[in-house]
Amino acid sequence: MATYDSDTGLVRVVQSKERFTMARIESRNIDSPDETRRFQAHGHADVVTIGDFTLGRGTFEPGWKWSNDVKPVAGTDSCQVRHTGVCVSGQMTVRADDGTEVSVGPGDVFVMEPGHDAWVDGDEPCVLFDTGMAPYAKATG
């Protein structure tokens, strides 16, 4: 606790027995990732983890399709990862196991629940920032 003495102009600090937690601020650059996960072909994911927060930047090249490029690594019939993020360039179509399709493009914020396939549309790479990358494109078992 601090008190100000207006007569002397001094601040008196009294140490308390209470515990205080200092706020922590940490910054990392995605261009120096902790890990780069290469897909079977057609791209990769750069992954940075700070504490319990993980962010990935997925670069999906033309011709990329989850069922061709990640399924062999994941070992599941469809992607079982929940993705939340934003598309910054390119276009990707996502098809849920129930047949629902949604396309995302630059500026689109998305939530993709587990149980989907996806592919790049067009001849431009699709770049996504995704908070669901901690388990993505990692071998199961």
Regions found by a protein language model. Name each.
Residues D97-G115:
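Short acidic-glycine-tyrosine-enriched beta hairpin
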